[in-house]
From Swiss-Prot:
The lineage of its organism: Eukaryota, Metazoa, Chordata, Craniata, Vertebrata. It is found in: Secreted. Its main location: secreted. This is Cystatin domain-containing protein 1. It comes from Rattus norvegicus. Keywords: Disulfide bond, Protease inhibitor, Secreted, Signal, Thiol protease inhibitor. One of its GO terms (cellular component) is extracellular region. It comes from the Eukaryota.
Length: 130
């Protein structure tokens, strides 16, 4: 009988943990200020870390979520290769490359936002060509 109580407590704790993992990220609106800033940071980091000469620009935001009790954002972004080079002055309105140079990527980012310090960190990023 005495072994049943710890077993029951263990099952309750495990069940609660599994339930909270599923609820860890909640949907947010795509125009939330800190989310928008995190998206811009993720795209800039992608361009900085990408070995290609051309920059990419945001085409579409898919998933927009925030981790409960934090400022960690989870986002799905579709980006397209532009005609602009990394060192061009105004890369925000660059047209997309067409034809043989056309390329799109789908990325999932987790960004930790500390906007009150103007500090953002990409925690994870995974990108695949589409």
């Amino acid at each position: 009988m005495s072994w049943k109580v710890p077993m029951l407590v263990g099952l309750v704790v495990l069940g609660t943990h599994i339930w909270t993992i599923n609820k860890e990220f909640l949907d947010v609106t795509k125009d939330l200020d800190y989310f928008v800033a995190s998206v811009e940071f993720a795209v800039a980091q992608f361009n900085d870390n990408n070995s290609e000469e051309n920059t990419y620009r945001l085409l579409e935001v898919g998933r927009a979520q925030k981790k409960t009790w934090t400022m960690i954002f989870l986002m799905d972004l579709e980006m397209g290769r532009t005609i602009c080079k990394k060192h061009d002055e105004n890369i925000h309105n660059c047209p997309l490359l067409q034809g043989s140079g056309e390329k799109k990527v789908h990325c999932v980012f987790q960004v930790d936002a500390r906007p009150w310090f103007s500090h953002f960190t990409v925690l994870t990023s995974t990108c695949v060509p589409t």
